[in-house]
């Protein structure tokens, strides 16, 4: 796969998956208040909705496909009505195919209203968190779920805190280089299949491992290596920002390669420009050490705006001018 390919995105997730997963990834605990088939309800959008106007009867442009948040304001509005008016307002609300309802700040739904939601097949949950915190955590979760992503053939390594994505055709030794970097104290994020996410309009790309492959590597001539078992917990990372792409190339004497490093190359991943370093491979070349230097050069430029090639060029020009 080329790095320039178009990203993918989930179209929806089930409410059952939402309920089972969000508590594992964020500091929020949802309590189930009714029993309905949560597999039949799907969430299509990352945005949430507080349905004050819908409860008041104004349902034009009601974004019912979003997760509905009922906080202190919405519950106070319902509770101030007599039972018939309250049921009428809530009935007008649950006639839409809502994914689910979440009550915040430990608010409670009257039994008759909960029964109406159950009859409509709408899951109802509650949380002790405030509406503000609940919406922040759920939006963060849904942002991750609906982010652009793509799978790439390569290896992802944390080198001196810099996220380095190794790419190149099969058989060039990407896995061997990644393994050598791990042995030298760096951390493996993923090998063979690298899953890269871009959340919203952010310019940050996050690389993760394929959950089926985990931290296993295939080394030609050796077989499968379990990096976590062999090198311990220090040798693995769950995720890392993609900051530099290193492309391994077959040596071709007819081709001209970068010698000074003055020309900065980039490659585009999910619409984000990432620095690209192309390294030709030939016998005796220590690729591992070179990749460590690539990471150190990135840190020098990032923190001090220092580029060795530019510094050398400036020094030579100064000497000539003298």
Swiss-Prot record:
Residues 280-285 are annotated as: Important for the catalytic mechanism of dephosphorylation. SUPFAM superfamilies: HprK N-terminal domain-like (SSF75138), PEP carboxykinase-like (SSF53795). It is an enzyme of class 2 (transferase). InterPro entries: HPr(Ser)_kin/Pase, Hpr_kin/Pase_C, Hpr_kin/Pase_Hpr_N, P-loop_NTPase, Ser_kin/Pase_Hpr-like_N_sf. The keyword Magnesium applies. One of its GO terms (biological process) is regulation of carbohydrate metabolic process. It catalyses: [HPr protein]-L-serine + ATP = [HPr protein]-O-phospho-L-serine + ADP + H(+); [HPr protein]-O-phospho-L-serine + phosphate + H(+) = [HPr protein]-L-serine + diphosphate. ATP binds at residues 168-175. Its cofactor is Mg(2+). CDD domains: HprK_C. Its EC number is 2.7.11.-, 2.7.4.-. Pfam families: Hpr_kinase_C, Hpr_kinase_N. Belongs to the HPrK/P family. HAMAP family: HPr_kinase (MF_01249). The Walker A ATP-binding motif also binds Pi and PPi. Homohexamer. NCBIfam families: hpr-ser (TIGR00679). This is HPr kinase/phosphorylase. It comes from Chlorobium phaeobacteroides (strain DSM 266 / SMG 266 / 2430). The gene is hprK.
